[in-house]
């Protein structure tokens, strides 16, 4: 009986508590671009609470600050920079269609 119970026990893993993304001294403000830019994706979207690991109140304040910065044109609404450029056209040619048949 003891051996069968032992096989189902999981070993306790040690885990490190992550630091909160916003420290107590950080001020959430639309002018604080270094803080705001951490919570925006590469496309310029506001990241979710799950991704940011923020509390509801912090996420609300970050969202308001980002929107104010966008309105005052400190932040772009969209990030239109193309990171990947196509070198060849991807249109289908008749020769490719003939090969597949």
UniProtKB/Swiss-Prot annotation:
InterPro entries given in the database record: Ribosomal_bS18, Ribosomal_bS18_CS, Ribosomal_bS18_sf
Pfam families, A to Z: Ribosomal_S18 (PF01084)
Quaternary data: Part of the 30S ribosomal subunit.
Biological process terms in GO annotation: translation
GO MF annotations, alphabetized: rRNA binding; structural constituent of ribosome
Subcellular location: Plastid, Chloroplast
NCBIfam families assigned: S18 (TIGR00165)
Listed name of the protein: Small ribosomal subunit protein bS18c
Keywords, alphabetical: Chloroplast, Plastid, Ribonucleoprotein, Ribosomal protein, RNA-binding, rRNA-binding
Cellular component terms (Gene Ontology): chloroplast; ribonucleoprotein complex; ribosome
Name of encoding gene: rps18
SUPFAM superfamilies associated with the record: Ribosomal protein S18
Predominant cellular place of this UniProt entry's protein: plastid
Family, as annotated: Belongs to the bacterial ribosomal protein bS18 family.
